[in-house]
Amino acid sequence: MVFFKDLFIFKSLIKGSLYSGHMKKKLLNYLPLFALMLFTVSMMAQTAPDEDTNSSIACPSSGVFQNNTTRDVDIANPDNVGTVDDRTCYADYYETSVYGETWGAYNITFNSNHWDAPNTLQPRIERSLSRSQETGVGSYARFTGTLRILEVGNTGTFGSTGSYLMQAKGKHTGGGGSNDPAICLYLARPVYGPDANGNQVQVSFDIWREQINFRGGSGAAGRTEVFLRNVLKDEIIDIELEVGFRQDPNDPNLKIHYSDAIIGGQVFNWNIPEPERGRESGIRYGVYRVKGGRAQMRWANTTYQKVEVVDNSTIPAADIYRIKNVETGEYLTSSGSSIIASTSGTGSDKEWEIISAGSGSSYVNIDSQVRGIIRFTGGSSNPGLVSTNFSPPNTDTDKVWTVIDNNDGTVSFETRNLGRFLYHDTNNMITHSANIDDRSKWNLESTTLSVDSQQIASVGVYPNPTVDGFTISLDNISAEKVQIFNLLGMLVYEQKTNESSIHIDNMDNFDSGMYIISVTANDNKVYQTKLIVN
């Protein structure tokens, strides 16, 4: 902190009572020398008053920090907000009092993760914060705090050097990546300079944003690093990170999923790719990753706030289906790269989204909740299906399907416009075939519709199927809004109401096919049922 003290004295000389024309002239004469002195002092490493200077980075042989039964290892009434995730046997979270503040201390060392199998994942002491689990415009998670970086990991290789200070988190639809993927991580890499004895030590840190290129992205192909700024060792830095959803200024019908950071007064905003796939917004902070040496960071003045706004622009979760074959009663299932049939409809590997293949496209992608979209291969001689890692929307000609409504409550999926259909064959293989029978027909079971039959029973529609019009009855629901969506999730009807029933006789927006009626109540609960238009 010598640098900041000297800078304060210099400013006092310029602005204080000693300031005069004569003094100004003398100061200007010495300014280059003084500036050099400041630069030299600033780059000369100072040991922070609460820095861990232990020469050993090994976990204590006593096992005092092993904590084999829990990762939530905390002190009573911690000053820092959030729940601890402690995966290091080197140290536990503790607090120090320096510079007039209470600081949470986060220290980890190379090979100190004893939890994850061991050392398959990097050591960390982080704090997790409850996530904003809605995706409507105005939903966000916001963290603020004050940070001092004292040391970060170093391997001598650029890519593996550095430690993370915070990260934006958030799950997404359509599969791909880990079960709890990072959206972007904020990484500190060391800059070296001399200490008082001339030894090369960490004197400052370059801050980088490691951002995904696509949902679930990891590694060199899946992420990009962007340099943000440099901060000095032990410099007191104000931090703000907000992750959430805002309206796209270029299209009011679209939204942006963002991760906006302010680091030491400098703004670094970033829009997350594939915002329509985002399901939540979360934040973790502390210290994470050390592939060589030790990492230690100090956090103070931490706060957290979240806002959750329901997204009513599309069917809430109703566009996630179990796809059941009419002939066999078995469910379409993603099993690794294969598509198989299962007698059970339980599990996310039987859950699918039917998503438009692109703006203006009449085709759809069939997207697994645990993997990616279905690709069809071969023709009549060697037909096959592959569960890919590709995400929707995708217009590749071997990954697009036409949804055909059979006007009996079932649908068929045609491979593009090739006259071949998703098919459960007699050999129990899921394939595509030119045969048109009940093995090419499928029931779409909405995961929302099948969860709570008591909710569904309170929404009625008659006549159903219909041709000329229909009535929606709302039994025991204090309704606020009625919406009707087609199978692609497009809104075709919306009406605010406080009545117990609605009659619709204008069918101009209703082509033949299946629809989902979604009723939002005053308490924000959503009730849904199916409608078939002939």
Swiss-Prot record:
Signal peptide region: 1-47
Temperature dependence, free-text field: Optimum temperature is 50 degrees Celsius.
Cofactor: Ca(2+)
One Pfam family named in its UniProt record: Beta-tre_PLH30
Entry keyword set: Calcium, Disulfide bond, Lyase, Metal-binding, Secreted, Signal
Marked site (Neutralizes the sugar carboxylate group at subsite +1) residue numbers: 167
Cellular compartments annotated: Secreted
Sequence positions that bind Ca(2+): 63, 68, 86, 88, 91-92
Residue span of region Ulvan-binding domain: 316-449
Name of the protein described by the UniProt record: Ulvan lyase NLR42
The species this protein was found in: Nonlabens ulvanivorans (Persicivirga ulvanivorans)
